[in-house]
UniProtKB/Swiss-Prot annotation:
Catalytic activity: 5-amino-1-(5-phospho-D-ribosyl)imidazole-4-carboxylate + L-aspartate + ATP = (2S)-2-[5-amino-1-(5-phospho-beta-D-ribosyl)imidazole-4-carboxamido]succinate + ADP + phosphate + 2 H(+)
GO BP, sorted A to Z: 'de novo' IMP biosynthetic process; cobalamin biosynthetic process
EC number: 6.3.2.6
Organism field: Macrococcus caseolyticus (strain JCSC5402)
Pfam families: SAICAR_synt
Protein name: Phosphoribosylaminoimidazole-succinocarboxamide synthase
Disulfides per UniProt: none
InterPro entries in the cross-refs: SAICAR_synt/ADE2_N (IPR028923), SAICAR_synt_PurC (IPR033934), SAICAR_synth (IPR001636), SAICAR_synthetase (IPR050089), SAICAR_synthetase_CS (IPR018236)
Keywords from the named record: ATP-binding, Ligase, Nucleotide-binding, Purine biosynthesis
Pathway: Purine metabolism; IMP biosynthesis via de novo pathway; 5-amino-1-(5-phospho-D-ribosyl)imidazole-4-carboxamide from 5-amino-1-(5-phospho-D-ribosyl)imidazole-4-carboxylate: step 1/2
GO molecular function: ATP binding; phosphoribosylaminoimidazolesuccinocarboxamide synthase activity
Gene for this chain: purC
Gene3D superfamilies per record: ATP-grasp fold, B domain, Phosphorylase Kinase, domain 1
Highest rank taxon of the organism: Bacteria
Family membership noted in the UniProt record: Belongs to the SAICAR synthetase family.
Length: 233
């Protein structure tokens, strides 16, 4: 078993099986592209359990991802994919960067979900880019762009319904995709409070990493509460 890649939140290892990786979730938490960074015991476990729950439920509803199975509280087995260097963001309500960028009032619901692409390049601070930029950079062609948007909106519909079952609002989220050995585009990376913005419908309390970004509460307590809500479904 060899370390293939290490990022801010995960380590990726090779396995004895071709085209299969083992992912280990770390206890590190970052914000602002790593400008703020801490180690919090139990964070990796929570994100792995939450992501595994979402990927398993999405699979039952027909949405394929790189996820194969949960190996332990902090580990997953996944299909090897070549990550497409885009963060695909879906916004249902105005919050975060779009409020600063375009002047929307925080919490305003969009008439329909908005899909945005961000170029995954730390040196450039992951800039927002258009479909034409995606093509000029050689990241994806028209067909792949359409497929990324199609899957992102399907995932959004599924997640919105799950959040609704917990009396929560899915404000926005970011996901990543990769291509398998056959060129199929698959959901990859994770879906967790690290990558979603989630509010309580009544109190507007955060159930996401904003509690860490804004120093408004305990990240571990918040993620634990969210996981407990998932388990109760």
């Amino acid at each position: 078993m060899t370390l293939v890649y290490e990022g801010k939140a995960k380590r990726v290892y090779s396995t004895d099986e071709d085209h299969v990786f083992r992912i280990e979730y770390k206890d590190e938490v970052t914000a602002g592209n790593g400008a703020k960074k801490d180690n919090m015991a139990g964070k990796g476990r929570l994100n792995n359990l939450i992501t595994s729950y979402f990927f398993e439920r999405l699979a039952r509803q027909g949405l394929e991802s790189h996820f194969i199975k949960k190996l332990s509280d902090t580990e997953q087995l996944v299909k090897a994919v070549t990550i497409i260097p885009l963060e695909v963001v879906v916004r249902n309500y105005a919050a975060g960067s779009i409020v600063k960028r375009l002047g929307f009032d925080k919490g305003v619901q969009f008439k329909s979900p908005l899909v945005e692409f961000y170029y995954k390049e730390d040196a450039l601070n992951d800039p927002i880019i258009t479909d034409d930029h995606v093509k000029l950079l050689g990241i994806a062609d028209d067909d792949d762009i359409a497929e990324l948007k199609r899957q992102a909106l399907i995932i959004n519909d599924m997640l919105v319904k799950m959040m609704d079952e917990m009396n929560l609002q899915l404000i926005d989220f970011k996901i990543e995709f990769g291509k398998d050995q056959d060129g199929n585009i698959l959901l990859a990376d994770e879906i967790s409070p690290d990558t979603c913005r989630i509010w309580d419908k009544d109190t507007k309390e955060n159930f996401d990493k904003d509690v860490y970004r804004e120093d408004t509460g305990s990240l571990i307590d918040t993620y634990t509460q969210f996981y407990n809500k998932l388990e109760a479904l």
